[in-house]
C-alpha cells in the first residue's frame, strides 16, 4: 500500500473514532445541567442539595447567592465565618469550622476542665479524665499524663515481679510463669502437699477425694493415670450417632475425622489417617487443607495460610495513569498515544480530532469539581471526601459506611465525617479510640480450678476465687459486684462477691447437667444458661428460687449464650448439624436463625452493644467474625490458625476483642474492626473456658419493667422481658414453671398433667419443694431454707364424685366451640402461635396491645413445655 493510501486510511479511521457528542463544545456553549443539579453562573453543574447549604461549591459562589441567612441555635458554636457547629465540638482537638476558629488558641486556652478531668499542661488546650492519669497510655498529646507517676506499689497479698507488675501471691512458685519474666518462679523450694492432698506430676496439689474419680483434675491427668488408678478413666459421655468420641472424651462431628485439622484436645481425630489428597476440582493449601478450585486467586484468603492468593497474576494489566487500553483490547503505554504511530490494531490510540485538545478549557469540561485533561479526552475528578456519581458530578462520600472509621459514633458531613463517643466514653485524641471513663477495666476468666482477673491498663494479675473443681462458664452482675460461674463436675451454678476477701461462694442453682455457658440479665435479675446434655436453654432468678426451660427443642449442641435485656433478646450458638447462631425474645418468643451459612463450630459469642453487633468464634474455621443484630453485614475480623487454633470464648470492650484459645492456653486481644494489633495478655493457663470484661459500662443501666407498676409485674412466677420489635411491643410477659401453663388472666399458672422435674440420673436425689407462690416447679435445690412437703394421693371416691360434673362441663364447652365456629365461619383470618400478631387487610403486620388486666404487662399465650426426662435417662 502506498504512503498516500496509508495516510488516507489513517484519516478515515481517525474520523470514525472522533466523538460525536461532548458536554463542552468548542464554540463555548455551556452544558445543560440535569433536573437534579444546579447550574452555576460559570456553567458548572453541582448537585441541587448543595444549593444554599452554607458552602460555596461553585467556584464563583453563585450557589450561595440570594439565600435566606441561617441563624445558629443556642446549642451551637458560631464560627468566625458564620458557620454553625455543635458546642461540644469546640476545643475537641479537631477543627470543624472551615476557618478553624473552633480550635483557636484564644478560645481554647480559656477553657476550664470539667470535674473529674485534669489539664494536659499550661501549653495544652486538652483535658482528660482523672482516671487516665498514669494508666500506662499517653493520652495527652504531650505525654504529660504519664510523667512523674512513680513506681506501682503492690498490695500486701500481691507479689512484685521484676518488671514491676503485680501478681497474686498464690501464683508464686506454682510452676507457671505468671510474671512473664519468670521472677515468680525463682528460688522456689520443692513443693509439698498436705496429708489430705495428692501431688500431681506438675507438683500442684489437689484433694485426695478427687483422685481416680474419672475426672482429670491435674493438668497432666496424673490423678487419673493407669499407674495411679490401675485402670483407664471411665468416660461417661455418649456421643450421638452423627459424632465420634475423642480419646480425651469429648465428641466431634464424624465428618471432621481425618480432615487434616485436629479438633480433639488430644488430636486423636487425626491419628491413623490415610494420606490426604485434594480432588481434581480443588486447590491444596500449603497446610494440606483443600478448597474449591474456583476460590484460588479470587482476592479472598480462603486458605488459612493465604496460599491460595500467592503468585496470582493480575488479569487486568491496564491499570494506572501510565497505561492506555485500546478499544481493540490491547494495553499500551500512555507515551505511545497520539505519537502518530499505530500501536492499537484499530488505531484507537491515534484519533485525529482528540489528540492534544484541552476540553477542560470550556466549561471545565462539564465537571462539577476537577477536570483533568488527558492526551485523548479528559476525565472528571473530585476533591477529598467526594466521589463521582455520574462521571461528571461529584457527590458526598458517606465515610460512615466504612467499618471502624470511627471508634463508636460516626456523623457523616459534607466532604468528611465526625467521630463522637457514647455516654461514659471520651475520645483519646492520641489514638482516636473512645476510652471508658471511670475505673480501670479488667478481664476475668476461668482457669478450671480458679477464677482470675487481669487489669487492662496496669496489668495487675490476681486470683479472685480459688479451690474450684471444674469451672466452665462465667458471667457477672457488675452493679451488684457479683460473679456467677458454672462448675461441670458439681453440676451447679455458684456465685460470690467479687470483693469478698474471705473467698466464700454459694451454690445458687443445682442439677445443671452439662452447663456450656451462662449469661446474667443485669436489669431483670435473672440468669440464662445452655445445657449440652439436656439440649436445653433455661432461665432462673439469680437466687435460683424460680427456674424453667426457655427452649427444649431443636437444640443439638447448644454452646455460648448472650443477652441484651435493653432490647429483650437472647442469642446463642449451636455447633450441632447444622451449625447456627440463633436469637429469640428473652421470654421465649420470636425465635429465629441469625447465622446459618459458612459456620461450623461456633464456640463463643459476645455482643457489642455500642455498635449493635454480634461477634463469634469458629473453632473449625479458625475465624473471628461479626454480623449486625439482624444477621446482616457479615464481616471477617480475623482468620488465623496460629492465634485461633481452638478458640473457646470471647468478650469485647472499647475497640478491642479478647478471647481464650484452648490449644494455646492463652488469652489474646486484637482490634475488633480489623483483627490487627494482636497481643498476648496471659499465657500458661490450665483449661481456661470462659472470659468476660469487668467494667460498669459493659452492662448499661435499663428500666426493669417488671417492677414498674407492681412487684414482679403481677406475675405469679417468672416475669421476663419481651423482645422490643417495635414501639408497640409489650415490655414483659409472665411465664410459668415447667409443667404449668398460664391461665387466661396472663398472670397465674395452672398445672398440666405432665409436670417436669430436674432430677438427674446419677448421684443426685431431688426433692419437690413447695414455694410460697403455691407452685411446685420441680426438684430444685437452693441454698435458702425450705420445708420438705409430701403430698398424699387423692382418694378414688373424690374422683368419682367429680366425674359427672366434669362431663357436664365438657359438653358445655363443646357446644360453645361449635357455636363460635359457626359464627366466625366467614371471617378471613390467619392464626399464629402468638395471637397478638394479626394479619391486616393492608398486608401489614400489626400488633394488638390489649391487656388482660390493668395491672399486668402485655401477655403472650403460655409456652407448652415437654418433659425431657426420657431423653436424659
Swiss-Prot record:
Domain LDL-receptor class A span(s) in chain numbering: 31-69, 70-110, 111-151, 152-190, 191-231, 237-275, 276-314, 316-355
CDD domains listed in its UniProt record: EGF_CA, LDLa
Tissue: Abundant in heart and muscle; less in kidney, brain, ovary, testis, lung and adipose tissue. Strongly expressed in neurons.
Sorted UniProt keywords: Cholesterol metabolism, Coated pit, Disulfide bond, EGF-like domain, Endocytosis, Glycoprotein, Isopeptide bond, Lipid metabolism, Lipid transport, Membrane, Receptor, Repeat, Signal, Steroid metabolism, Sterol metabolism, Transmembrane, Transmembrane helix, Transport, Ubl conjugation, VLDL
Membrane spanning stretches: 798-819
LDL-receptor class B repeats (start-end): 439-480, 481-524, 525-567, 568-611, 612-654, 655-697
Record cross-link Glycyl lysine isopeptide (Lys-Gly) (interchain with G-Cter in ubiquitin), residues: 839
Extracellular topological intervals: 28-797
GO cellular component, one term: membrane
Effects seen without this gene: Deletion mutant mice show an increase in serum triglycerides under a high fat diet, suggesting a role in extrahepatic triglyceride uptake. In addition, these mice show a reduced high fat diet-induced inflammation and endoplasmic reticulum (ER) stress in adipose tissue in conjunction with reduced macrophage infiltration.
SUPFAM superfamilies given in the database record: Growth factor receptor domain, LDL receptor-like module, YWTD domain
PROSITE patterns assigned to the protein according to its UniProt record, in alphabetical order: ASX_HYDROXYL, EGF_2, EGF_3, EGF_CA, LDLRA_1, LDLRA_2, LDLRB
Entry comment on modification after translation: Ubiquitinated at Lys-839 by MYLIP leading to degradation.
A Pfam family per the record: FXa_inhibition
Domain EGF-like: 356-391, 396-431, 702-750
Record topology, Cytoplasmic segments: 820-873
GO terms under biological process: cholesterol metabolic process; dendrite morphogenesis; glycoprotein transport; lipid transport; positive regulation of dendrite development; receptor-mediated endocytosis; reelin-mediated signaling pathway; regulation of synapse assembly
Subcellular location: Membrane; Membrane, Clathrin-coated pit
GO MF entries: apolipoprotein binding; calcium ion binding; calcium-dependent protein binding; reelin receptor activity; very-low-density lipoprotein particle binding; very-low-density lipoprotein particle receptor activity
Function, as annotated: Multifunctional cell surface receptor that binds VLDL and transports it into cells by endocytosis and therefore plays an important role in energy metabolism. Also binds to a wide range of other molecules including Reelin/RELN or apolipoprotein E/APOE-containing ligands as well as clusterin/CLU. In the off-state of the pathway LRP8 and VLDLR form homo or heterooligomers. Upon binding to ligands, homooligomers are rearranged to higher order receptor clusters that transmit the extracellular RELN signal to intracellular signaling processes by binding to DAB1 on its cytoplasmic tail.
Quaternary state and interactors: Homooligomer. Binds to the extracellular matrix protein Reelin/RELN. Interacts with LRP8. Interacts with LDLRAP1. Interacts with SNX17. Interacts with DAB1. Interacts with PCSK9. Interacts with PAFAH1B3 and PAFAH1B2, the catalytic complex of (PAF-AH (I)) heterotetrameric enzyme; these interactions may modulate the Reelin pathway. Interacts with STX5; this interaction mediates VLDLR translocation from the endoplasmic reticulum to the plasma membrane. Interacts with CLU.
Protein name, as recorded: Very low-density lipoprotein receptor
Amino acid at each position: 500500500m502506498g504512503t498516500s493510501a496509508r495516510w488516507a486510511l489513517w484519516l478515515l479511521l481517525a474520523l470514525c473514532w472522533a466523538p460525536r457528542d461532548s458536554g463542552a463544545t468548542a464554540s463555548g456553549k455551556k452544558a445543560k445541567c440535569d433536573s437534579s443539579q444546579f447550574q452555576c453562573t460559570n456553567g458548572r453543574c453541582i448537585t441541587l442539595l448543595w444549593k444554599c447549604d452554607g458552602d460555596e461549591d461553585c467556584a464563583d459562589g453563585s450557589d450561595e447567592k440570594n439565600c435566606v441567612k441561617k441563624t445558629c441555635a443556642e446549642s451551637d458554636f458560631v464560627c468566625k465565618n458564620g458557620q454553625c457547629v455543635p458546642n461540644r465540638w469546640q476545643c475537641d482537638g479537631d477543627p470543624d469550622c472551615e476557618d478553624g476558629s473552633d480550635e483557636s488558641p484564644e478560645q481554647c486556652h480559656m477553657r476550664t476542665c470539667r470535674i473529674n478531668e485534669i489539664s494536659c499542661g499550661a501549653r495544652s488546650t486538652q483535658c482528660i479524665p482523672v482516671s487516665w492519669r498514669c494508666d500506662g497510655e499517653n493520652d495527652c498529646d504531650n505525654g504529660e499524663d504519664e510523667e512523674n507517676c512513680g513506681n506501682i506499689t503492690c498490695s500486701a497479698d500481691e507479689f512484685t515481679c521484676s518488671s514491676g507488675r503485680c501478681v497474686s501471691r498464690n501464683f508464686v512458685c506454682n510452676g507457671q510463669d505468671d510474671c512473664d519474666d519468670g521472677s515468680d518462679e525463682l528460688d522456689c523450694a520443692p513443693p509439698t502437699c498436705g496429708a489430705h492432698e495428692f501431688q500431681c506430676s506438675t507438683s500442684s496439689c489437689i484433694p485426695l477425694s478427687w483422685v481416680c474419680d474419672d475426672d482429670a483434675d491435674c493438668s497432666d491427668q496424673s490423678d487419673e493415670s493407669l499407674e495411679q488408678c490401675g485402670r483407664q478413666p471411665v468416660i461417661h459421655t455418649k456421643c450421638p450417632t452423627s459424632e465420634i468420641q475423642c480419646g480425651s472424651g469429648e465428641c466431634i462431628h464424624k465428618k471432621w475425622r481425618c480432615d487434616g485439622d485436629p479438633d480433639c484436645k488430644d488430636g486423636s481425630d487425626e491419628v491413623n489417617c490415610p494420606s490426604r489428597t485434594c480432588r481434581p476440582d480443588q486447590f491444596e493449601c500449603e497446610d494440606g487443607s483443600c478448597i474449591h478450585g474456583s476460590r484460588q486467586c479470587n482476592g479472598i484468603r480462603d486458605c488459612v495460610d493465604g496460599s491460595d492468593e500467592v503468585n496470582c497474576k493480575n488479569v487486568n494489566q491496564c491499570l494506572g495513569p501510565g497505561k492506555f487500553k485500546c478499544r481493540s483490547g490491547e494495553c499500551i503505554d500512555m507515551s505511545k498515544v497520539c505519537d502518530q504511530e499505530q500501536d492499537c490494531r484499530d488505531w484507537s490510540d491515534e484519533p485525529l480530532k482528540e489528540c492534544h485538545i484541552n476540553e477542560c478549557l470550556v466549561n471545565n469540561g462539564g465537571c462539577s469539581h476537577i477536570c483533568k485533561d488527558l492526551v485523548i479526552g479528559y476525565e472528571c475528578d473530585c476533591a477529598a471526601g467526594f466521589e463521582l456519581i455520574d462521571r461528571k458530578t461529584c457527590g458526598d462520600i458517606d465515610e460512615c459506611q466504612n467499618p471502624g472509621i470511627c471508634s463508636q459514633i460516626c456523623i457523616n458531613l459534607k466532604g468528611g465525617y465526625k467521630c463522637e463517643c457514647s455516654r461514659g466514653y471520651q475520645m483519646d485524641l492520641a489514638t482516636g479510640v473512645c476510652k471508658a471513663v471511670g475505673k480501670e477495666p479488667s478481664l476475668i476468666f476461668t482457669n478450671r480450678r480458679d477464677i482470675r482477673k487481669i487489669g487492662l491498663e496496669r496489668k495487675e494479675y490476681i486470683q479472685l476465687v480459688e479451690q474450684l473443681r471444674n469451672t466452665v462458664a462465667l458471667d457477672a452482675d457488675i452493679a451488684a459486684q457479683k460473679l456467677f460461674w458454672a462448675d461441670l463436675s458439681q453440676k451447679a451454678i455458684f456465685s460470690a462477691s467479687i470483693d469478698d476477701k474471705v473467698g466464700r461462694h454459694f451454690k445458687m442453682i443445682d442439677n445443671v447437667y452439662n452447663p456450656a455457658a451462662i449469661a446474667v440479665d443485669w436489669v431483670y435479675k435473672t440468669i440464662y444458661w445452655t445445657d449440652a446434655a439436656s439440649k436445653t436453654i433455661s432461665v432462673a432468678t439469680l437466687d435460683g428460687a424460680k427456674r424453667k426451660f426457655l427452649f427444649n427443642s431443636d437444640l443439638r449442641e447448644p454452646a455460648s449464650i448472650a443477652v441484651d435485656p435493653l432490647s429483650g433478646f437472647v442469642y446463642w450458638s449451636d455447633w450441632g448439624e447444622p451449625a447456627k447462631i440463633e436469637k429469640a425474645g428473652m421470654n421465649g418468643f420470636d425465635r429465629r436463625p441469625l447465622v446459618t451459612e459458612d459456620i461450623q463450630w461456633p464456640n463463643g459469642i459476645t455482643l457489642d452493644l455500642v455498635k449493635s453487633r454480634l461477634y463469634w468464634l469458629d473453632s473449625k474455621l479458625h475465624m473471628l467474625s461479626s454480623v449486625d443484630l439482624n444477621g446482616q453485614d457479615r464481616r471477617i475480623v480475623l482468620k488465623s490458625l496460629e492465634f485461633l487454633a481452638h478458640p473457646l470464648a470471647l468478650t469485647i470492650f472499647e475497640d478491642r476483642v479478647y478471647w481464650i484459645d484452648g490449644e494455646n492456653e492463652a488469652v489474646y486481644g486484637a482490634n475488633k474492626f480489623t483483627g490487627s494489633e494482636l497481643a498476648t495478655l496471659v499465657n500458661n493457663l490450665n483449661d481456661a473456658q470462659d472470659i468476660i470484661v469487668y467494667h460498669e459500662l459493659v452492662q448499661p443501666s435499663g428500666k426493669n419493667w417488671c417492677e414498674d407498676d407492681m412487684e414482679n409485674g403481677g406475675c405469679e412466677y417468672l416475669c421476663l422481658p419481651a423482645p422490643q420489635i417495635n414501639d408497640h411491643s409489650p415490655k414483659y410477659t409472665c411465664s410459668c414453671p415447667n409443667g404449668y401453663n398460664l391461665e387466661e388472666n396472663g398472670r397465674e399458672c395452672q398445672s398440666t398433667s405432665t409436670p417436669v422435674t430436674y432430677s438427674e440420673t446419677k448421684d443426685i436425689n431431688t426433692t419437690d419443694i413447695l414455694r410460697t407462690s403455691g407452685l411446685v416447679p420441680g426438684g430444685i435445690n437452693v441454698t435458702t431454707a425450705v420445708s420438705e412437703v409430701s403430698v398424699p394421693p387423692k382418694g378414688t371416691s373424690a374422683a368419682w364424685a367429680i366425674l359427672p360434673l366434669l362431663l357436664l362441663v365438657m359438653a358445655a364447652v363443646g357446644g360453645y366451640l361449635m357455636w363460635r365456629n359457626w359464627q366466625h365461619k366467614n371471617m378471613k383470618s390467619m392464626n399464629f402461635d402468638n395471637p397478638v400478631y394479626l394479619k391486616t387487610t393492608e398486608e401489614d403486620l400489626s400488633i394488638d396491645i390489649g391487656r388482660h388486666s390493668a395491672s399486668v404487662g402485655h401477655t403472650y399465650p403460655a409456652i407448652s413445655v415437654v418433659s425431657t426426662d426420657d431423653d436424659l435417662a
